[in-house]
Amino acid sequence: MCTHEDSRPSPSPLAAAAAAHTVPPQRSRRGTDTARSPPGARGGAAPRPMRVMIAPMDASHLAPLLTPAGWALLADLPPYDESTVLSVGARLREAGHPPEMVAAALTQQRLRTRAEAKFGPFASRMLFTPDALEQATRLVVSAHHAARYEHAGVQHVADLGCGIGGDAMALAGLGLRVLAVESDEATAALATVNLMVFPEVEVLCADALEVDLTARGIDAVFADPARRSHGHRIADPEQWSPALGRVLALRDDVGALGVKVAPGIDHAALPTDAHVQWASVGGEVVEAGIWCGPLAAEGPGRSALVLSDPPPASDDPRDAPSARVLRDPDCHDPSTPPVHLAPLADVGALGAYVHEPDGAAIRAGLVAHIAERLDAAPVGDRIAYLSGDALPDASLAPFVHSWRVREVLPLNLKMLKTRVREHDIGSLELHKRGVPVTPDAVRAAVRPHGQAHETWIMTRVGNAGDAQRARGAVIVVEPCEAPTVPVS
């Protein structure tokens, strides 16, 4: 059920359409009508009409799809193809479909194609706007959020700032009751459609901090404060909406609190008694999560969660991406600054390998821990490249990308251009940290046109405070075969 906290009448076209819309059921393999649920869902649930009482909003371009004709048109569209979209649109209009319905359906099909990276096959039955899709949590990450709540034994979760409903989907898929709260009326209406197959979910259009959690029997909260304003990221957590401090204050009423925050958050802004976990998917750092009370079973500290890509393609748990967690055993207060190690003395101290920790491990302050396990050192002062003579073992390999060092050159564009010509290099893979050059500028300067391939790491070697010994270098490397990691 989707309601407005103030129960205001006169719903907008989109809200009215969402109120009347029922997603057609899908025949399951068991022979019953059911909607497909995210991985881990305990059976499907028959969709049902929902009551919507929300204020007018400017999202009428989606309303044509929330009719039987609009939904049928969207369901019958072929896979989105940029090269044929104009001809498909013309054909549909010639067949008598209203132009606004055709435009909305084609736009939605394009967004669904983009959304597959976050929601896998479930994107094909969801509705999106560009902004809402960009801000949505990947389903593979939401599944890990939901697992914390299930393991904590909670029953009724308030998803504050639910967006289009990704985290609420994952929570409901594990059988938890969910109150999904969203202050933006248009986004709340989308969540209504995306979540209506889950009878355990109520969508509420309201200010997240105005909801009486106690009166509604809420025993856990997941919050996702808005971190953008007019298209720009907001760095200060106290300028988020709602402010991080106000969200953390909810622990006075509900001890089981989880908060999705920006991965670049300053460690000093973190609560001292929480566990904070940074997550990356396919090598991309996507978020940090603050976990409090029973949701932090591992205790206060910091960790990195590394998930493989792409998202799951079926309901079979064996198809789920692998997940690895690395924790700093010496950190019991996430607000403390990370340990910084002394760098190599100079280029001559480089080992046989260069290692780059995963971005989630870097954000979590785990570089020193990884260096210790590898018996390695940073190549430069506060540079996240490590060098040593050992490769990571299977337990550490998911958190480190390793290369074998072939040669070390000065960061001199004239000399590099000569190398490219003499070695017939036509393809360059460039990485950089700590030097004032860009890969594009280097590639343009050296002009690779040959047949060979090389990988260069451009970085600073040595202590930045020692001008005589620290210098820019190009480390020519080749990939190493990672140790086999058993699938969990």
Regions found by a protein language model. Name each.
Residues 2-4, 13, 22, 26-488:
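SAM-dependent transferase fold signal centered on methyltransferase-like domains
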